Design a protein with these regions (language model features):
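Bimodal "functional hotspot" detector
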Residues: 1-121
């Protein structure tokens, strides 16, 4: 399966909503899984790979087209977080690194402080 995180706004708060897509592919075919994941993401620009992904020692390297960058050459924090969260669900992935033009890209701000789920009791 491939898990894709999209966002949904409820009561003026943005939440990451996971959707699981069942696919038939070779277990080792990480490029196909990442391509499907990117195609399933709701984003105003097409998301695509420009080079093969690599998975070494638990680190998945994803090489993306430059069209995902904003005018100031940075990536949208929400998009970055969605890609990393989605890719982290792939088998054997412990860390995700995103690259554009062979340069590793980072979010403008730390995405680890985001709240994924809130349950009101």
């Amino acid at each position: 399966p491939v898990v894709v995180y999209n966002t949904e706004t409820i009561n003026n708060k943005e939440y990451y909503v996971p959707v699981t897509k069942r696919i038939e592919t070779n277990e080792n075919d990480i490029d196909t899984k990442v391509s499907i994941m990117l195609n399933e993401m709701d984003y105003d620009k097409p998301l695509s790979l420009v080079d093969q992904c690599s998975l070494q020692d638990g680190t998945l390297s994803i090489h993306l087209a430059a069209n995902i960058l904003n005018d100031n050459e940075s990536i949208d924090n929400t998009l970055y977080n969605r890609i990393v969260k989605s890719a982290s669900h792939l088998e054997n992935v412990k860390k995700v690194s995103l690259f554009v033009d062979n340069q590793e890209i980072d979010p403008v701000q730390d995405v680890n402080g985001e709240v994924d789920n809130r349950i009101k009791m």
